[in-house]
């Protein structure tokens, strides 16, 4: 969330003339911030195109990733350019009405992004816990409903200030700052970060526990499977009783075990990668949401 205040740090009722812009500082900031914005826009577009252009990526999990990219793309293309201009000029140059809309879109995109990570963590928990039943549990219809809920909840959290849930705005229109109304600050902090964060942490703790248990079970199953195969081979070599039925059964069990092992390995790897991404994301957001309710 990019809420900045202008040169005037108070909520004075008089309009202050904007301070002169330092050209060298403005150029440096423009290059750095512009580069970051372009990098963010292109990166998220590439994610969306890679999923759209490869049919084998048309799965619910990848739809969640596209949703995350869409939220970040909206943020980088509609919010950050005005934030960059705000930072370069040192004051808000777009008027009070647009300030309120800009702030609401900022909250909408950031909340949708964080809730998108929450949905991904739930998806990874189901994938690791139920790798064989995953396609029947996480259907396309349920996935789309989850994404619809993400954006609906994000919209509810973001539009409060537009309907008056904020402190009186300063008359100086060069000031655009975060609403400090205590009720909304607490509501948005809980809904946008702390509740999703709690769900994410619980889900990844469960993923860790299940992955550890499944890894132990699969290793044990692998040893048993090898032992059974050796026994069958030994019986055939010694020309004991016919073992055709046992061989077929053993082959079926081995195939089922191999499929389960492959699916679990994929889900575990995906969960580990996304866990690192989510962890970095949470660490980046945590300072802001720790200071926000206090400030």
Swiss-Prot record:
Q: What does UniProt give as GO cellular component?
A: caveola; cytoplasm; nuclear membrane; nucleus; plasma membrane
User: Per UniProt, what is the membrane topology?
Assistant: Multi-pass membrane protein
Q: Which residues lie on this side of the membrane: Extracellular?
A: 1-27, 89-99, 168-181
Q: Where in the cell is it found?
A: Nucleus membrane; Cell membrane; Cytoplasm; Membrane, Caveola
Q: Which residues are glycosylated?
A: 7, 13, 22
Q: Which GO terms describe its molecular function?
A: alpha1-adrenergic receptor activity; protein heterodimerization activity
Where do the TM regions start and end? Answer: 28-51, 65-88, 100-122, 144-167, 182-205, 274-295
Q: Which domain of life is it from?
A: Eukaryota
Positions carrying Phosphoserine: 215
PROSITE patterns per the record? G_PROTEIN_RECEP_F1_1, G_PROTEIN_RECEP_F1_2
The family annotation for this protein states: Belongs to the G-protein coupled receptor 1 family. Adrenergic receptor subfamily. ADRA1A sub-subfamily.
Q: What is this protein called?
A: Alpha-1A adrenergic receptor
What is the protein's species of origin?
Canis lupus familiaris
């Amino acid at each position: 969330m990019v809420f900045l205040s202008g040169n005037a740090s108070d909520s004075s009722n008089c309009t202050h003339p904007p301070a002169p812009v330092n050209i060298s500082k403005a150029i440096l900031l423009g290059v750095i911030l512009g580069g970051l914005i372009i990098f963010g826009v292109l990166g998220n577009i590439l994610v969306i195109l890679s999923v759209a252009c490869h049919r084998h990526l048309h799965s619910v999990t990848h739809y969640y990733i596209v949703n995350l990219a869409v939220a970040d793309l909206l943020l980088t293309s509609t919010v950050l350019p005005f934030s960059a201009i705000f930072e370069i000029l040192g004051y808000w140059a777009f008027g009070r009405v647009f300030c309120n809309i800009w702030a609401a879109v900022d909250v909408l995109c950031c909340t949708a992004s964080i809730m998108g990570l929450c949905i991904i963590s739930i998806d990874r928990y189901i994938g690791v816990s139920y790798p064989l039943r995953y396609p029947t549990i996480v259907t396309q219809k349920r996935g789309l409903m989850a994404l619809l809920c993400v954006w609906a909840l994000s919209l509810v959290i973001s539009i409060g200030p537009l309907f008056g849930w904020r402190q009186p705005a300063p008359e100086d229109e060069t000031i655009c700052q975060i609403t400090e109304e205590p009720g909304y600050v607490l509501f948005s902090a809980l809904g946008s970060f702390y509740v999703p964060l709690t769900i994410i942490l619980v889900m990844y703790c469960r993923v860790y526990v299940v992955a550890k248990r499944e890894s132990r079970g699969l290793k044990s199953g692998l040893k048993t499977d090898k032992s059974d195969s050796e026994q069958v081979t030994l019986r055939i070599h010694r020309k004991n009783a016919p073992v055709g039925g046992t061989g077929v059964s053993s082959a079926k069990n081995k195939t089922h075990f191999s499929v389960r092992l492959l699916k679990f390995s994929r889900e575990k790897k995906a969960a580990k990668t996304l866990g690192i991404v989510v962890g970095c994301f949470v660490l980046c957001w945590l300072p802001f949401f720790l200071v926000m309710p206090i400030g």
